[in-house]
Amino acid sequence: MPMASVIAVAEPKWISVWGRFLWLTLLSMALGSLLALLLPLGAVEEQCLAVLRSFHLLRSKLDRTQHVVTKCTSPSTELSVTSGDVGLLTVKTKTSPAGKLEAKAALNQALEMKRQGKREKAHKLFLHALKMDPGFVDALNEFGIFSEEEKDIIQADYLYTRALTISPFHEKALVNRDRTLPLVEEIDQRYFSIIDSKVKKVMSIPKGSSALRRVMEETYYHHIYHTVAIEGNTLTLSEIRHILETRYAVPGKSLEEQNEVIGMHAAMKYINTTLVSRIGSVTIDDMLEIHRRVLGYVDPVEAGRFRRTQVLVGHHIPPHPRDVEKQMQEFTQWLNSEDAMNLHPVEFAALAHYKLVYIHPFIDGNGRTSRLLMNLILMQAGYPPITILKEQRSEYYHVLEVANEGDVRPFIRFIAKCTEVTLDTLLLATTEYSVALPEAQPNHSGLKETLPVRP
């Protein structure tokens, strides 16, 4: 056979063998890559959590202009106010280099204006520095000193605490905080004493008082209205009263929203008739029973059950589902501990609310359940249940966020303020020339009876 023919015949065989070898090599590499991907599957949950946290951080950066802030004393600043002139700062976003430079320049100008005695200008410049860079520790400390000089001890202490949250070993802030902390604790205790005196006045109102009975009835409807409105429910006060009195639906309104009202009513009835006067510890089962009623008319599958999925709540990542039950057990132990019982009732109730909503044990209804637990603690201590108004929603969420960042005292003060407002309302409504709460109109004109809301 000619050589050319041999080569012509052998070449395809050589190409075929080489092709198979190449494919086997590629297949081995692919299998190796697949094996490398499969090996870490045992830790897939931790990886998912890391991804969630990364996504959460990215979202917070993208949304840095959409942070919820409460009303300010000055429209030119993003510092929110809870009581007095306490500014609440959030440092969830990374400040740009240009922002840091502007903040430093503003701080230097503020100190110069302060030295010259131009305190109003200095105040605005301090605010501007912190607006540009909320995590500027030196500005926080210097503004704290300025606030002390203005006799605003609570704001000064908050600013020092904020600085130490960011930089725990900042020497000047440590010294300043050591000076203001006992003063602030005294101020808080004095405020609790004022609340206690008002509680005694409310307790002295005759139980048969028709005015007290009337205002308590209206307060009941108002509480349901505001607590569901905070979560986005659009029903009016009159519509809520119609639903609870007739058990008939309001036409044109979401049945889910109406069932939220029925659930809140059922949960409040359960607390009032079963838990308030009961002697003994508050248990996990008690909280599950409250939640079962809160959510039972909207989502009976999830009602009274701990969540089984990871959730994100604003900037807060609650505990992993596998840790929820353990954390709830620890929370319940604290709830019934001597340390908790020795707290002022308002402080105890506020901390219980915060701790439960921090764990976020349920897929939905955590806020409503936390507010009900808070009121259960207050009522067991002889206080009336309090209402957080829907108009306070931004402030309410903001002080919760500040608590997540390490300072729960603004949230406690917020709850104390709500408690005092509730007490003042009861006292005002039971005086001779009282102005009671605006009543929900009993004549439901235009509200036709339709299919009953699920009982």
Swiss-Prot record:
Auto-AMPylated in vitro. Its EC number is 2.7.7.108, 3.1.4.-. One of its GO terms (molecular function) is ATP binding. It comes from the Eukaryota. Changing E231G: Impaired phosphodiesterase activity. Promotes adenylyltransferase activity. Disulfide bonds: none annotated. Residues 42-455 are lumenal. One of its GO terms (cellular component) is endoplasmic reticulum membrane. A motif (Inhibitory (S/T)XXXE(G/N) motif) lies at residues 227-232. The active site is at H360. Homodimer. Interacts with HD. The fido domain mediates the adenylyltransferase activity. This is Protein adenylyltransferase FICD.
